[in-house]
């Protein structure tokens, strides 16, 4: 007998916004039941910043949902370990390039793990694919899509590719008419881009048909993606800032070299602004993932990033992170009350997950995630469950509250939130605050817990929190509008 699950029909209902066509379209993989996904990864010369975190978490969320639907996902995310910035940073530090890149690769993996991201199935490094890059360049040159300059560089001739600009919706003639780009002596067109760079003193270099040199950035991804996933694959992703010129150039190179469509779907993660401004070191608003996680719990950061649709522009600020923390705490508090009433710890298994997706909230969750991975709407489903849990707990309908809590935790598993033991999460908030005195974030979290305790008639716990805050010099003032606080 064939077993069916609530997600059996959902696989065929997934729609993804394709940056190339500019519209949502039904997802139909090249091979039934399998997905090949390539995401442009990091150039490893520094610690990852909060923008990188959004790309990591956004595609981790997408991969998890595809897997939840039943797809066998081959997720490939590259590492650029040879680049002008890497060379410059190594020289500045007086550090070997290999040591520098490995140090930041290790740091990147630590950051991704802290944010709850799964490792990709493959993580190709550019320096391991030099042969494949050279082969692709040779094909482009032999087919008149590329040419060698007198200086030893090899360039891609953008005029040779009729569809150049189709991803970014740019017309080459218009670009040239409005261009102020100074034409390099060896370039035939100011928008021609380098495929192979002639060797410079004290830089890494490899033997090639055009002399000693190293690859350009764009050819790296074309060679690695097609080697790992084939000439055509299902999804290509990255940050919105890569759409032009990087992804545009990848299409031009790959489709000219193979004669095949490059990627079936293009996904781009939106920008992160900081306090309403573009993040940049010159503005002093540049934050690494480690900067942020020194102040906020990693799960809070993940929750913040998932609370907006992956394509939307997000404003990063302390107030936004505080709000995310308080919202996440409310979900954990709902679970805590139920566990206390039931006298058991919630444990999610496959049966519970199937039951959760069969429920009305589960169907709403599926609908949200199948609508271009809309994690924001999916999270609103979780809050609806939390409200129902609190209502049931308040009237001591313990069995209903327990069933709803099982649904909440099971659905949240797909987003990899709410999976810590409840007390571990709440103690982490209080523990961090205790190191330097209670932070505003920790105070707000305790006030939320106190309010929930009062709602559920756990007055002993409510008094404990009031006393704890009083001992820390925090005075509370209760009113019909809620609780406010001030430092004594």
Curated annotation (Swiss-Prot):
GO terms (BP aspect): cysteinyl-tRNA aminoacylation
Top-level taxon of the source organism: Bacteria
Residues that bind ATP: 281
UniProt cofactor(s): Zn(2+)
UniProt keywords, alphabetically: Aminoacyl-tRNA synthetase, ATP-binding, Cytoplasm, Ligase, Metal-binding, Nucleotide-binding, Protein biosynthesis, Zinc
Uppermost EC category: ligase
UniProt catalytic activity: tRNA(Cys) + L-cysteine + ATP = L-cysteinyl-tRNA(Cys) + AMP + diphosphate
Motif 'KMSKS' region: where in chain: 278-282
Compartments, as annotated in UniProt: Cytoplasm
InterPro entries: Cys-tRNA-ligase, Cys-tRNA-synt_Ia_DALR, Cys-tRNA/MSH_ligase, Rossmann-like_a/b/a_fold, tRNA-synt_1_cat_dom, tRNAsynth_Ia_anticodon-bd
Cellular compartments per GO CC: cytosol
Motif, 'HIGH' region: chain positions: 42-52
Keyword ATP-binding: yes
Pfam families: DALR_2, tRNA-synt_1e
One of the record's GO molecular function terms: zinc ion binding
Cofactor note: Binds 1 zinc ion per subunit.
Binding of Zn(2+), residues: 40, 221, 246, 250
EC code(s) of this entry: 6.1.1.16
Cited Gene3D superfamilies: Cysteine-tRNA ligase, C-terminal anti-codon recognition domain, HUPs
Family the entry assigns: Belongs to the class-I aminoacyl-tRNA synthetase family.
PANTHER family xref list: CYSTEINE--TRNA LIGASE, CYTOPLASMIC, CYSTEINYL-TRNA SYNTHETASE
Subunit structure: Monomer.
Protein name: Cysteine--tRNA ligase
Organism name: Psychrobacter arcticus (strain DSM 17307 / VKM B-2377 / 273-4)
Taxonomic lineage: Bacteria, Pseudomonadati, Pseudomonadota, Gammaproteobacteria, Moraxellales
């Amino acid at each position: 007998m064939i077993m069916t699950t609530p997600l059996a029909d959902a696989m065929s209902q997934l729609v993804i916004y394709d940056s190339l066509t500019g519209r949502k379209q039904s997802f139909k993989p090249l091979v039934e039941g399998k997905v090949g996904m390539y995401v442009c990864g990091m150039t490893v010369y520094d610690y990852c910043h909060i923008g990188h975190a959004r790309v990591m978490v956004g595609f981790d969320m997408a991969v998890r949902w595809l897997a939840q639907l039943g797809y066998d996902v081959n997720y490939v995310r590259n590492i650029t370990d040879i680049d002008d910035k890497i060379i410059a940073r190594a020289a500045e530090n007086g550090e070997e390039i290999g040591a520098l890149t490995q140090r930041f690769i290790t740091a990147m993996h630590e950051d991704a793990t802290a944010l709850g991201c799964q490792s990709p199935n493959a993580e190709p490094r550019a320096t391991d694919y030099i042969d494949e890059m050279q082969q692709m360049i040779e094909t482009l040159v032999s087919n008149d899509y590329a040419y060698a300059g007198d200086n030893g560089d090899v360039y891609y001739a953008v005029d040779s590719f009729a569809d150049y600009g189709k991803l970014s919706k740019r017309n080459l003639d218009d670009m040239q008419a409005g261009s102020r780009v100074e034409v390099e002596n060896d370039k035939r067109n100011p928008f021609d881009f380098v495929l192979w760079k002639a060797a410079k003193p004290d830089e890494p270099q490899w033997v090639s048909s055009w002399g000693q040199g190293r690859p350009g950035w764009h050819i790296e991804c074309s060679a690695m993606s097609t080697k790992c996933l084939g000439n055509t694959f299902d999804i290509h992703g990255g940050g919105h800032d890569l759409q032009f010129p990087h992804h545009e150039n990848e299409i031009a190179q790959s489709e000219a070299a193979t004669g095949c469509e490059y990627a079936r779907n293009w996904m781009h993660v939106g920008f992160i602004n900081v306090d309403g401004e573009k993040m940049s070191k010159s503005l002093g608003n540049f934050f690494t993932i480690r900067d942020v996680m020194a102040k906020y719990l990693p799960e809070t950061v993940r929750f913040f990033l998932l609370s907006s649709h992956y394509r939307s522009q997000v404003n990063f600020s302390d107030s936004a992170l505080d709000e995310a923390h308080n919202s996440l705490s409310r979900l954990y508090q709902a679970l805590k009350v139920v566990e206390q009433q039931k006298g058991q710890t919630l444990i999610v298994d496959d049966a519970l997950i199937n039951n959760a997706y069969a429920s009305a909230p589960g169907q709403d969750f599926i609908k949200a995630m199948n609508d271009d991975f809309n994690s924001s709407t999916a999270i609103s489903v979780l809050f609806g469950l939390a409200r129902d849990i609190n209502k049931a707990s308040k009237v001591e309908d313990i069995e209903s509250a327990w069933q709803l809590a099982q649904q909440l935790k099971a659905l949240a598993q797909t987003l990899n939130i709410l999976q810590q033991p409840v007390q571990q999460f709440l103690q982490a908030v209080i523990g961090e605050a205790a190191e330097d005195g209670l932070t505003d974030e920790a105070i707000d979290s305790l006030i939320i817990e106190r309010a929930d305790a009062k709602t559920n008639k756990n007055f002993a716990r409510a008094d404990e929190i009031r006393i704890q805050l009083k001992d820390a010099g925090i005075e509370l003032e209760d009113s019909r509008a809620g609780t406010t606080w001030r430092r004594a």
